[in-house]
Design a protein with these regions (language model features):
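Catalytic or ion-coupling anion/metal-binding cores of large enzyme and transporter domains
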Residues: 1-59, 80-82, 88, 102, ...
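A short, small-residue-rich loop immediately preceding and capping a beta-strand
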Residues: 53, 124-142, 163
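Low-complexity, highly charged intrinsically disordered N-terminal segments
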Residues: 65-87
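Glycine-rich nucleotide/cofactor/substrate-binding loop typically near the N-terminus or early
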Residues: 75, 92-97, 375, 383
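Structural motif
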Residues: 87, 132-133, 164, 579
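N-terminal small/polar loop signature for handling phosphorylated ligands or for N-terminal nucleophile
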Residues: 87-124
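Extended, charge-rich low-complexity interaction segments
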Residues: 112-126, 607-619
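Proline-centered loop/turn at the N-terminus of a beta-strand
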Residues: 158-160, 575-577
Length: 687
């Protein structure tokens, strides 16, 4: 019975069959299949394909509503002659961690996910996997795990590993009910015109976590100003929270999730017509997916193994990343996957795609172009999801259409795809935006970084920040920033305490005096600090950089920062640039500079900046420099001079001490990953 002809130690050895048979029996029973144990034995000993069905745990938001589809997939694998194994492979939800110590663990959970699933596949000997989900950390981590296992199989001349990814369903969006809207009428009459407009704009959007968070932030500001009492505030928050607490509001239906779906699909491993789904796939669709996987396993189609598809489609994925809006997380994910297949690809290489590939996908809840609306159009035949995007890019030869997918080459697929109609997907001739807003940066504090301009900052507003001197507001670690964000005007007060009257006056003089527009500017030369501060704030002339050091991958795992939810009476994104060696949220609506290399812990110049330092920003040439005042204006500080500041060593020592507060099992990984430039990938520490 234990034949050696399959060259499979799980078959030739005695123990595996006795362990695996009851596992498969239980998996089938839970899926509603009354399997015969003898048939499980026969399939296992005859080398039938072993296919893992990988999904998130019960506490994983994108997994909501997927249980029945997972059971049907298990039934289809069994019905088509395979052996199904259910694998729960979850990743923590980053949305839950904002503002907490858990922020530090979100990105590297991707790496732990990779290690866990890769070892799982190697130990259990799976031939293929069907992965359900849409969380970028879980899906990218799982994809790299499958790549690593595939390459390991190929090195020992075993069967390649195959995979398909099935993104989570897009739930129905919910808008605020009329009854709940009416509860806000008494408060609405007490708000100023700007806040009324903000509230109306929020109520026109689908109720999702970030919308509820913005409503709560507005109510918090009103409470601080005593416009609303605590009891009334609690009732209003409860009414909106009920609208937002639905499956259609989770991360599976977020604007970011559409980018994740499209980039994952661009690798050719998402089945056709399943990249944007409102309804669960039917049994015929699932059966076709399973049959294709089993065919690839039995024929050993090395060209469509998971590692091969990733290698063939990596440059296509970079083009789709730019075309769908340039989500900053994928700068790290694409380099992480490139590292897995042994391909050299840096963040700078990916960002160059933005010079050639315009943004052609328009997803914006505020404008009515929601993810759910696009899913409705897709279901009604208005677009073909990733196939429409690939067809549009292929028209200008921005992708390699000869690259393979599990369902044939892109050239074959796009022949049947719908053309861009300008509702969600635009033509490259008339793109939604000429660029996705990502720029490579450098300066005396770093060798490389990435600037991102939110869509609302790409049409003229950028001139308010470009070629201006900004006053630094320095934080060592995200914990200090979170404390100030929770305090009314805490961030601005931090600058106000440190900045001098001369700093305010001369930065205003250099930034605005020559661009006064109509009429002569007021004479500020005799004004005191308090009067200058009030004038600059009220006229939106203050320019600052919120610098958060110690958020890099080696210092704290590269947490994701955002300024949207703060207690400031002045919108920070309208006057501040966010700078960090960590990550910045996709929802950030201002200008940000992130992924700074080298990070502060590694001796980067970011560790030496002080609050009230002058930083000159030149987005046109991709530069930002710490400068000092001179009689003729300012001069750029030398990189060595900046790094030699005494603050630098003290802060590095403090960051080393803070690392001891992280979880021990997490802390050991920090020294074993690369910098942000290489995707925070596994690396051997060399002495």
């Amino acid at each position: 019975m234990h034949s050696n002809k399959f060259r499979d130690p799980l078959i030739s050895r005695a123990q595996p069959v006795t362990i695996i048979t009851p596992i498969v029996d239980e998996t089938l029973r839970m899926a509603g299949v009354s399997a015969v144990r003898e048939e499980i034995l026969d399939r296992f000993m005859n080398g039938q394909p072993r296919i893992a069905v990988v999904h998130g745990g019960d506490d994983h938001p994108p997994n909501v509503g997927s249980k029945e589809t997972i059971r049907r997939m298990i039934r289809q694998i069994w019905a088509n002659g395979g052996i199904p194994f259910e694998v729960s492979q979850s990743a923590p939800c980053e949305e839950l961690s904002y503002g907490t110590e858990g922020m530090n663990y979100a990105l590297l959970a991707r790496n732990f996910c990779t290690a866990s699933l890769a070892s799982h596949i190697e130990l259990h000997g799976y031939d293929a996997a069907v992965v359900f989900g849409v969380c970028d950390k879980m899906m990218v981590g799982s994809l790299r795990a499958l790549i690593e296992a595939d390459l390991a199989h190929q090195r020992r001349k075993a069967r390649p590993v195959f995979a398909t990814l099935i993104p989570s369903l897009i739930g129905r969006e919910i808008r605020v009910m009329d009854d709940d809207r009416r509860k806000f009428e008494p408060l609405r009459h007490r708000l100023n015109e700007t806040e009324r407009a903000e509230l109306d704009q929020l109520f026109h959007r689908p109720m999702k976590p970030h919308v509820y968070a913005q409503v709560k932030a507005l109510l918090d500001r009103c409470f601080h100003r005593r416009i609303v009492q605590e009891g009334e505030k609690d009732d209003l928050e409860r009414s909106i929270a009920k609208c937002s607490s639905v499956p259609g509001a989770n991360c599976g239906a977020s604007e970011a999730s559409m980018v994740h779906r499209m980039v994952l699909a661009s690798f050719g491993i998402v089945p056709r017509n399943l990249d944007i789904s409102m309804k669960p796939p039917d049994d015929q669709q699932l059966s076709e997916v399973v049959k294709r996987l089993i065919q690839a396993i039995q024929k050993r189609e090395r060209r469509v193994s998971v590692a091969s598809l990733t290698r063939y489609n990596l440059t296509n994925a970079a083009a789709v990343w730019s075309a769908t809006g340039g989500h900053p997380a994928w700068l790290l994910h694409l380099t992480y996957l490139a590292d897995a297949i042994g391909k050299k690809l840096s963040i700078e290489d990916i960002s160059k795609k933005t010079l050639k590939v315009p943004q052609i996908l328009a997803i914006d809840d505020a404008a009515g172009n929601s993810v759910y609306s696009m899913a409705v159009e897709n279901q009604n035949g208005g677009n073909s999801g990733i196939d429409t995007i690939m067809r549009t890019l292929a028209e200008k030869r921005l992708i390699e259409d000869r690259a393979p997918t599990l369902d044939g080459s892109w050239m074959q697929r796009i022949m049947e795809a719908r053309s861009a109609n300008g509702n969600f997907v635009y033509s490259t001739m008339t793109p939604f935006l000429p660029t996705c807003g990502m720029l490579g940066m450098h300066g005396n504090m770093c060798s490389a970084a990435i600037a991102r301009l939110a869509p609302q900052n790409r049409n003229g507003i950028i001139q308010r920040f470009d070629r201006k001197i900004h006053l630094a507001i320095y934080y060592l670690g995200q914990k200090e920033l979170q404390a100030d964000l929770a305090t009314l005007d805490g961030v601005l007060e931090r600058l106000k305490r440190k900045v001098s009257r001369e700093d305010l006056y001369y930065t205003w003089l250099l930034n605005w005096h020559s661009n006064s527009g109509n009429g002569a500017p007021p004479d500020l030369s005799e004004w005191n600090k308090a009067k200058l501060w009030t004038y600059l704030l009220s006229n939106k002339l203050l320019r600052a950089m919120i610098v958060v050091a110690g958020a890099g991958p080696h210092a704290s795992g590269m947490p994701e920062l955002q300024l949207a939810l703060n207690a400031s009476s002045h919108p920070l994104s309208g006057m501040c640039v966010l700078v960090t060696d960590g990550r910045v949220s996709f929802q950030h609506d201002g200008i940000s500079i992130a992924h700074i290399v080298p990070e502060a812990l590694d001796g980067g110049g970011l560790a030496a900046i002080r609050t009230a330092d002058w930083i000159y920003l030149d987005l046109t040439h991709g530069e930002f420099q710490v400068v000092t005042q001179t009689p003729r204006g300012y001069k750029v500080l030398g990189a060595k001079e900046l790094a030699s500041r005494p603050d630098c060593k003290k802060r590095i020592n403090e960051l080393e001490r803070r690392r001891l507060d992280l979880l021990p099992s997490f802390r050991i990984l920090l020294d074993q990953v690369s910098s942000a430039e290489a995707g925070v990938s596994p690396t051997a520490k060399t002495n």
